[in-house]
Amino acid sequence: MSYEKNARVINDDIFDLINSCFEKERNSRNINSRCNFFDEYKDYFVLTDDGSYSIKSKEINHKVETLHTSTGAISESFEKFIKPMKFNYNEDIAILDICAGLGYNSSAAIADFIKNSSDSNLQINMVEISKATLACGLLVPSPIPEHDITKKAIENELIKKDYASISYEKCEIPENIDINVYIEDARQTIQNLEDNYYDAIFLDPFSQNMAPELFSLDFFRQFRRVIKDNGIIATYTSSAPVRAGFIESGFHVGQGPIFGRKQGGTLASPNPEVLDKSLPKNDEIRIALSDVGIPFRDPNLNNNSDFILDKRSEVRRNARHNTKISSAVKTPIFLTKKMDDEKLKRRVERNLAKMNIPSTTSKEAFYILECEENYKEKQDLKNNSRNRILDM
């Protein structure tokens, strides 16, 4: 089985229908199958609250996800991936869009660039392993005019790859915008990219349980190599192992915007001063002290999802009660706190006792969390989430 097939996460039915659509286009040299696709198979798409469309994942571990939050697919792109970036549009901008999907994040970046730039240039490198996922971006109605620019870049590459055969998209890509589309495993792409080059990285795969290979510590080390010192990575997830992976690969981390979810996503940068908000205090404690903060590993950037998930589970089991406090009932967040719930207290203190911590209010508990006494939401070079987590 090819890695692309193994890594494929969009719904199998829509995947097959898209492939069939473009096969008809290639065989007939006729655009009708592409033009009629959305109306014919509209039920396979998910209409989000802002009027833009998303698609479903296949069922993995008894779960089905969509590519975007139901609150609004294109709105999510602006809120989570564009607004936190603080681009200086007086200078040229370079963006790496990992798991480009339907092209919404790149389209939002183009819209913001056109609105705010004068004589600067924008380069976007879009990376997506699945031709069908990119092709789906050609089939959905454009949620904003700039999506037509992205569609043209996608179409050009799909024609080069002999997946599409007709140049149908009429929008011209502006001369000061350069869009490169890589249809391959992002782990291989990134190893060939230039050092210290990108102002922003958009990391937008399906969840860590579906694509842990794109959330590994080792993948993030490549991010650290290619991003500029003031560059920012944005991802929707608030996952502890993802944030731990960023920290262990040399990044500072902060909380991203809350949009369509209960928690904010994650922002990462070599420079803490470009990150507005620290992680929530309890998140810092769990990452630092419990086994939930053990990152995903993929040392040679070539393992499959199941292997990475299984290996992390094994490492967690070995670390639990030895080098890490058990994450059960979120044990570490109760350190230094008095507990009224006796049943919960017994469970927490049983976990703590296995690490030679007598109680939640013992001197050991207060010593471990000493650095959190200086917690503040605004980050600076000395007082920030990364430093507090490493101190613990």
What are these regions (language model features)?
Residues 95-97, 101:
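Class I SAM-dependent methyltransferase core
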Residues 136-193:
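S-adenosyl-L-methionine
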Residues 243-267:
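Conserved Class I S-adenosyl-L-methionine
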Residues 213-229:
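A short glycine-rich, Lys/Arg-flanked "PGG" loop and its adjoining helix->strand segment in the class I
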Residues 102-107:
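Glycine-rich SAM-binding Motif I of class I
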Residues 1-93, 111-149, 153-154, 167:
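Rossmann-like AdoMet
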